[in-house]
């Protein structure tokens, strides 16, 4: 028994060392950065009314997200041109920009990420949750986005959708006596960009 005891004592230590090595090998990169391409990123919106559904688009000005894979702490900004709203109807779009968004006074719509939950797989599909602040029409509101992500090489694609209760957030409802519209706008984003993982 005295001969076997040193070997038995060494086994837990060896196991712990192997486990630590495995965890370190499997650990994700310390920092993940995603830079969006405005030309490949599409932002659409949908607003329902009593007669039909109005659909339109916005243009991304710039977008980047960086986050620490260990802590989830995030930074960056996704910036949308508020004056780029386009539904294909000039009169309606002019009213939206002037009376609802007041884009001359509030030219940008901004999402600022604060925390990311989940892990971006190196060459696969994954889903993360991005919690942050959404600023529109001079007001800032908490917003969490669920983002399915696909990575191919250093290229990344992601999509998400969420609702903006614009009337509740202080913007004017453009309804008239004879035409009532919803007080919530649905936003859909199909984003594409470049992924960089930094150790």
Task: Describe the residue ranges of each PLM region.
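Bacterial N-terminal signal peptides
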Residues: 14-24
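Low-complexity, acidic/polar, glycine-enriched regions of mature
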Residues: 29-199
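Bacterial N-terminal signal peptides that target proteins for export
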Residues: 2-16
């Amino acid at each position: 028994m005295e001969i076997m005891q040193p070997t038995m004592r060494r086994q837990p230590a060896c196991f712990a060392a192997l486990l630590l090595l495995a965890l370190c090998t499997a650990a994700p990169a310390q920092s993940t950065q995603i830079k969006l391409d405005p030309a490949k990123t599409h932002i659409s919106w949908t607003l329902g009314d009593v007669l039909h559904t109005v659909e339109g688009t916005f243009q991304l000005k710039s977008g980047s997200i960086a986050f620490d894979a260990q802590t989830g702490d995030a930074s960056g900004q996704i910036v949308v041109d508020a004056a780029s709203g386009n539904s294909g109807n000039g009169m309606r779009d002019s009213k939206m920009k002037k009376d609802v968004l007041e884009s001359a006074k509030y030219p940008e719509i901004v999402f600022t990420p604060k925390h990311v939950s989940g892990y971006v797989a190196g060459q696969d599909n994954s889903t993360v949750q991005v919690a942050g602040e959404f600023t529109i029409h001079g007001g800032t509101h908490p917003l969490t986005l669920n983002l399915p992500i696909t990575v191919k090489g250093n290229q990344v694609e992601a999509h998400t959708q969420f609702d903006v209760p614009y009337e509740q957030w202080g913007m004017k409802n453009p309804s008239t006596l004879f035409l009532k519209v919803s007080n919530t706008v649905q936003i859909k984003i199909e984003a594409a960009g470049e992924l960089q993982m930094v150790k």
